[in-house]
Amino acid sequence: MYQKTGKIMIDGVEFYPDYTFEDFKKTPFYTNQDGIRIIPLNGAKEIDDHKYIVNLFFRDGKLYMISLACVDMDVPFEEEEKRALLHRQILDEYGLSDVNTFPWGTIKAIYDSRSNSSTIAFLYQ
């Protein structure tokens, strides 16, 4: 992950601040999605030494968020807090804390107790 610049490479496609839905249409990930709903990328994607389920969120035609849910370990639904801990450990590997602000946006580990889900989020301004 390229936290200082906000760039992230997924299966040979680079995502970055100011990335647009028009840019996304030129990638192998594009399969006629509308850019309004959440766009899940098919299958687990390897980034550095971890595998993630990746979702993209666009707002007003620009990339708003990349959501990474690490699937290195199988976590039962009722134990999702273990995945949340793993996400914090991954950020720690990069020298990051749970919430990190940069000129381009934010990287943070999110755990939502209502939906019992966790993710590493790249939030672009």
Positions of predicted regions on the chain:
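Short helix/turn-capping signatures at newly exposed starts of structured segments
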Residues: 1-125
